[in-house]
From Swiss-Prot:
Substrate binds at residues 71-78, 143-145, 156-158. Belongs to the LipB family. This is Octanoyltransferase. In the reaction, the free carboxyl group of octanoic acid is attached via an amide linkage to the epsilon-amino group of a specific lysine residue of lipoyl domains of lipoate-dependent enzymes. The active site is at 174 (acyl-thioester intermediate).
Length: 218
């Protein structure tokens, strides 16, 4: 197995905690020959707190469940119409094979994949050095959080495509007071702002940046 082999799994709509458990199990049981994987999924409405999450950033508790996660970062919201891309990558294997991939470079690749995808739709976006994620006109369109275990990554990014953004008003997104969120549907026609249309472009940009050339999709 080489670090250019990748499996993409299209998981549809699944419960956050179920997929989170599967990511942990995958990471704990993988070995040096396990191919890297990308999981594409949407989650029903849920707030997730990162490891550094502070309770005060949940402003108005509602019937939306709150899950304490093991990813980096603060609180965020997941809901239908948001494309999640989880990246299960053996960073240490990439390093051993000379690609010099580290966590910072993985974060940069994730952000750049989103910037390139949005550019495909004529949306100008940018990352921020002091606040991981991707922004359009100072509004956040993509959140990012990773966990590294045994030299391998899991969790990933959440790109707002065509969703109900109102639950974000119940939190300080990613721990930033007053941060406004946006989505692709704010800038392009609804028929273009669809997860099944955007996800392939996102994956293509990411796989090209990391040099995967043996890609299988399930």
């Amino acid at each position: 197995m080489t670090d250019t082999t990748l499996i993409i799994r299209q998981l549809g709509i699944q419960d956050y905690q179920q997929v989170w458990q599967q990511m942990r199990e995958f990471t704990d049981t993988r070995n040096a020959l396990t191919p890297d994987e990308i999981w594409l999924v949407q989650h029903p409405a849920v707030f997730t707190q990162g490891q550094a999450g502070k309770p005060e950033h949940l402003l108005n508790p509602t019937d939306i469940p709150v899950v304490q996660s093991d990813r980096g970062g603060q609180i965020t919201y997941h809901g239908l119409g948001q494309q999640i891309m989880y990246v299960l990558i053996d960073i240490k294997r990439h390093k051993a094979n000379g690609s010099e991939l580290n966590v910072r470079q993985l974060v940069t690749a994730l952000e750049q994949s989103v910037v390139s995808t949005l550019a495909d739709y004529g949306i100008k976006s940018y990352p921020k050095a002091d606040a991981p994620g991707v922004y359009v006109n100072e509004q956040k369109i993509c959140s990012l959080g990773l966990r590294i275990r045994k030299g391998c990554s899991f969790h990933g990014l959440a790109l707002n495509i065509n969703m109900d953004l109102s639950p974000f008003r119940q939190i300080n997104p990613c721990g930033y007071i007053g941060l406004e969120m946006c989505q692709m549907a704010d800038f392009i026609p609804t028929e273009q702002a669809q997860c099944d249309k955007v996800a392939p472009k996102l994956v293509t940009h990411f796989t090209q940046l990391l040099g995967y050339n043996d890609v299988t999709t399930y």
